């Protein structure tokens, strides 16, 4: 479903924990990280699409989160031709997004990246609100910056953004929460305990090749 200008209606999600850290998901079998997002289906409202995408990509339910804010209008980004299927080139230009800022009310172990048969992410982590966006695919960086900036006014304690962000860049994670590889996965009764394995990684390249986060 495209608008007259060739943009697909979409929702983006910035998910915060109690420390105002932001959820980042590593795209399946890639070395790029992004926020949950997805298209709005015909007949859906942006809020309905947001809750559906939230569950599909993170396993979280409406009771696990609270809506803090949303962008006033659509934010757009164009997709380079090399990422567009040949049959829709000339018609499809990119995405227009309504962004939601959510506060997570549940626990980390409520996050499950295998909530559907087609997961988007194979690892996830919390990171500070303001970080360099080097690990985000280039054509999405501007819209990420716009969404983070507009929604920062809803933070409980507004994050202070330095002119020159300091600290490690997004790809360099000291701790990445990840489950065991599928061939060694231990079945755990999640009604009793939430079990996670923390994989040490100084850079993305050092992460295990088959990492699935969540239950």
Curated annotation (Swiss-Prot):
Coiled coil: none annotated. Its EC number is 3.6.1.-. Its cofactor is a divalent metal cation. It comes from the Bacteria. Residues 6-149 form the Nudix hydrolase domain. CDD domains: NUDIX_Ap4A_hydrolase_plant_like. A motif (Nudix box) lies at residues 38-59. It holds the Pfam family NUDIX. Keywords: Hydrolase. The keyword Hydrolase applies. The keyword Hydrolase applies. One of its GO terms (molecular function) is pyrophosphatase activity. InterPro entries: Nudix_hydrolase, NUDIX_hydrolase-like_dom_sf, NUDIX_hydrolase_CS, NUDIX_hydrolase_dom, RppH. Belongs to the Nudix hydrolase family. RppH subfamily. This is RNA pyrophosphohydrolase. The gene is rppH.
């Amino acid at each position: 479903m495209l608008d007259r200008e060739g943009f697909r209606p979409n929702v983006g999600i910035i998910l915060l924990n109690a420390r105002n850290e932001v959820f980042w998901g590593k795209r399946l079998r890639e070395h790029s990280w992004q926020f949950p997002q997805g298209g709005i289906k015909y007949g859906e409202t942006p809020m309905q699409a947001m809750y559906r995408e939230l569950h599909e990509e993170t396993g979280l339910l409406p009771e696990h989160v609270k809506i803090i804010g949303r962008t006033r209008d659509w934010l757009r980004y164009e997709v380079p031709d090399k990422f567009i299927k040949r049959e829709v080139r000339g018609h499809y230009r990119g995405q227009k997004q309504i962004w939601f800022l959510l506060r997570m009310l549940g626990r980390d172990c409520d996050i499950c990246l295998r909530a559907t048969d087609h997961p988007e992410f194979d690892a996830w982590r919390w990171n500070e609100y303001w970080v360099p966006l080097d690990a985000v695919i280039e054509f999405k960086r501007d819209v990420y910056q716009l969404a983070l900036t507009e929604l920062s006014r809803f933070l409980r304690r507004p994050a202070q953004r330095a002119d020159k962000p300091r600290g490690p860049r997004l790809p360099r994670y000291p701790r990445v929460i990840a489950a065991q590889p599928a061939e060694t996965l231990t079945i755990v009764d999640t009604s009793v305990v939430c079990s996670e394995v923390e994989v040490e990684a100084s850079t993305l390249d050092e992460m295990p090749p088959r990492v699935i986060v969540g239950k």
